[in-house]
């Protein structure tokens, strides 16, 4: 310890390694700059060390004595010796932000750079701060300059703002300014994996010390692993390649301490990011697409030139830390984050977000132009299926990215009603409609549009008080009263139906897993007043949890089994005699209405599978799943993996079959990209199935505009009232095939 202030300049044993890329912070001595009083030679000790309990005066700042080993915040570890840190024999690794009280030469005084006046030095001038220095220096530590060259006075700004939220800002900003060296974060992770704590400007090691020497463990060769982080920090980048944003698996991206002036909108493609560091650049704004990064927990924007933030950042409902120190942020935004923290600012942006322009209308895709252009009367039917997201499920805990107004049922139900009226389909199948909404709103409102409805709530509503039962959701099926006659309606409760099966005795899984789920299907049997065609319309909602694939499969099997029984009953249903639709009496002066065509007689069907079948609903099963394959292929083996060897009577012993030839309506275009759209889940869950032997799909409602989706991370929002989208299909009833009779022209001459 006798060598004092010259100690860190003495050559040590082993080889020295220096940064190959010149950096202003990697010097062995301080270089005099214009307007500074930095020393040009060796200085003696400054014994007038200020108390750690107060900020030191600028004239006695530790920066004026760069060789003072007693300043904890200015250690001279700029050299690696023998592949290790130059100070490794004296220092010990300690937890972050804990004072190193066992180091007698650490005075724990803050480090004010009063001798730097250029804006660029805020980024490029970098010294080593030990972990204990930062904690002990706070709350006194604040850089005396920011990127735009304007000085800040700590005492003026932090009197009221020095709460826990702003303290965290200052601490993280200080850490960020230490991380200006190239690939700092990547090197830190690599060194920590080897058991070494790296200094900010530590050069990369080129040698490994032997096993066990100086407590350093030699890295073991390991197989290649997947990576999820990318560090481009300190590279002087001025632009980013578009290829970068194809790495959609990235979870951490460091672009700090570069020269970026703009962030490309394609940043929105990296939707798995949870950590994004853009500190120390020249950014003046952020793109709207930043709101697509809903998994972000840390977003560092320290030391840029950002004055305002896009409202789309309100979508970042998981964001825990937003670093904005060192930006000329406007007073309103800065006040929110200084006083209440990141969560309050994000909530403010979310609730104040303006309503954007709606997307273009979804295309109407015509698959059979002959059916649309035909002049003769054709037997057509349009069917809409829609999971409306019931009021009790639309909570901030589930949909934190949606403003409070968007989640309010009064707002959403009006959007739903307007959408139903605009499509004006013959049949509507709604899932997740509670009893109160059906009885008090939709049934009344849709009656003005010639609809009649059939509704059943889920099983839990039985035994409840009337007021409580109103909040239980169920399935509602509406049909045009002027076009169809309701012949029959049935409820299928999957759990109750399963326990009534003769083979359910002794099957524990039926009671423990299936019976507890109260999901249902509503079946209506309709007849077209004019053509006499009959339809079985199914409206189903299956269990959602992916961990219960066996339950969804058995629910589907029970549904198809019950439909098989019902279809055979409906095949023997007697003809309908009174088919005239109700008509209001004519008022005086009202013009004569044209007479209706004479209704055709009721169609007769030889078997249940000949009746046109339309099966709609939220099956919570994606294409290729066991439930999907059972419906599409008509059978499923008893040993299917989704059953997980659980016991469900004959369904798991014999297998599952059904006689219907069903196809997905949207299978004609390869299915939609999604029917359920949230930040964490985007998949196909909703379907309109039809019996291909009796129906032909002629038109479909297309997908949501792709450009619109580039700025919207999930539904519901101001234009889509549910996390699901509506499905709409048009079908043409196939004519019955009669017996082919060959004409007899008599004997023919050769």
Swiss-Prot record:
Keywords: Cytoplasm, Exonuclease, Hydrolase, Leucine-rich repeat, Magnesium, Metal-binding, Nuclease, Nucleus, Repeat, RNA-binding, Transcription, Transcription regulation. It is an enzyme of class 3 (hydrolase). The keyword Cytoplasm applies. Its EC number is 3.1.13.4. One of its GO terms (biological process) is transcription elongation by RNA polymerase II. Belongs to the CCR4/nocturin family. Acts as a catalytic component of the CCR4-NOT core complex, which in the nucleus seems to be a general transcription factor, and in the cytoplasm the major mRNA deadenylase involved in mRNA turnover. Ccr4 has 3'-5' RNase activity with a strong preference for polyadenylated substrates and also low exonuclease activity towards single-stranded DNA. This is CCR4-Not complex 3'-5'-exoribonuclease subunit Ccr4. It comes from Neosartorya fischeri (strain ATCC 1020 / DSM 3700 / CBS 544.65 / FGSC A1164 / JCM 1740 / NRRL 181 / WB 181) (Aspergillus fischerianus). The lineage of its organism: Eukaryota, Fungi, Dikarya, Ascomycota, Pezizomycotina.
